[in-house]
């Protein structure tokens, strides 16, 4: 099915039973151990459309703040709201103040998604991938109404 997925996306915590489908989405087999550990430890969320896992995100921390370490969306579901749903679910479950993510400077789709969802550039990290700096993004999360400072 090639229709728009945005109204049928369900985001939930990944379970060990999701692991095969999650790993099949990632085109980088060198990350299999890291992704497997994220699933088992409860740091991975999956996006489902019509009961098919079509994306996942891995949560971590960055200098004590919530950090979206990895976002992967099935190629046939890109630009249909799956990535945005995963990011928004991450932000809504994150701690107060701010959340971070990063991507290579060459990853124009992810950079556009970050900017569309209210993230701003916080800086760059050189020399992780030669000639392709890592761009770090931050999104300030407003405090819940009635929350104490």
List each model region and its residues:
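Conserved GNAT acetyl-CoA-binding A-motif
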Residues: 93-105
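Acetyl-CoA-dependent GNAT
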Residues: 9, 13-70, 74-76, 87-88, ...
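Conserved N-terminal glycine/acidic-rich loop preference
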Residues: 108-126
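Conserved acetyl-CoA-binding loop-helix of GNAT-fold acetyltransferases
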Residues: 73, 79-92, 112-116
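Conserved catalytic-core motifs of GNAT/GCN5-like acyltransferases
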Residues: 100-102, 120-136
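Conserved N-terminal entry element of GNAT/NAT acetyltransferase domains
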Residues: 1-17, 139-149
């Amino acid at each position: 099915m090639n229709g728009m997925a945005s109204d049928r996306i369900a985001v939930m915590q990944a379970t060990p039973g999701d692991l095969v489908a999650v790993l099949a989405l990632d085109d980088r087999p060198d990350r299999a151990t890291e992704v497997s550990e994220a699933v088992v430890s409860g740091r991975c969320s999956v996006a489902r459309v019509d009961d098919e896992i079509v994306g996942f995100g891995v949560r971590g921390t960055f200098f004590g703040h919530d950090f979206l370490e990895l976002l992967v969306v099935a190629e046939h579901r890109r630009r249909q709201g799956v990535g945005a749903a995963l990011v928004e679910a991450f932000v809504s479950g994150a701690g107060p103040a701010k959340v971070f993510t990063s991507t290579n400077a060459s990853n124009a789709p992810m950079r556009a998604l970050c900017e569309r969802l209210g993230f701003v550039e916080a800086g760059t990290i050189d020399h992780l991938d030669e000639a392709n700096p890592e761009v770090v993004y931050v999104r300030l999360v407003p405090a819940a109404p009635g929350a104490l400072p």
